[in-house]
Regions:
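A conserved beta-strand element that flanks and buttresses the S-adenosyl-L-methionine
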Residues: 22
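A short glycine-rich, Lys/Arg-flanked "PGG" loop and its adjoining helix->strand segment in the class I
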Residues: 36-49
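Class I (Rossmann-like) S-adenosyl-L-methionine-dependent methyltransferase catalytic domain
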Residues: 1-12, 30, 34, 51-126
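Glycine-rich phosphate-binding loop signature in dinucleotide/nucleotide-binding domains
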Residues: 13-17
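Short catalytic micro-motifs in class I SAM-dependent methyltransferases
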Residues: 25-29
Length: 126
């Protein structure tokens, strides 16, 4: 387990040079200041790294989706404009067809074309 609160571990992590960073459902649990710090760290230290994140979004949600958002423990579920401002270094797209029920997620990505990959995958499984 790598505790990034320890400065020695940050140096170790920087030497590791990951080629893929995946943040699954965590951004909506973190305030804007923390996300901006993480984004700066990724941009400055891992600019060539593949990046992918997925989080719920407030965006014309269905009734069930709205209820799930209200019950979510994440205090920072944002709308598309808030995410656009906060995640401006990354590409993004919103989907509502990943799960069997209608539930909107926003994907942020960098250094690969996730949207094209996703659309091709959806065609293949249809």
């Amino acid at each position: 387990n790598l505790d990034l609160n320890d400065a020695n571990n940050i140096d170790l992590f920087l030497k590791f040079k990951p080629n893929f960073i995946f943040i699954n459902g965590a951004i909506h649990h973190l305030d804007d200041k923390t996300i901006k710090s993480i984004n700066f760290f990724i941009k400055s230290s891992f600019s060539d790294c593949y990046f992918l994140s997925v989080d719920p979004i407030k965006n014309n949600n269905s009734f069930l989706n709205t209820m799930m958002i209200k019950l979510d423990r994440g205090k920072f579920i944002r709308n598309r404009f808030q995410y656009a401002e906060l995640m401006d270094a990354f590409e993004s797209f919103i989907i509502d067809d990943f799960y069997k029920m209608k539930f909107e997620n926003i994907f942020h990505y960098k250094n690969f074309d996730l949207k094209d990959f996703y659309l091709n995958w959806k065609k293949e499984i249809s």
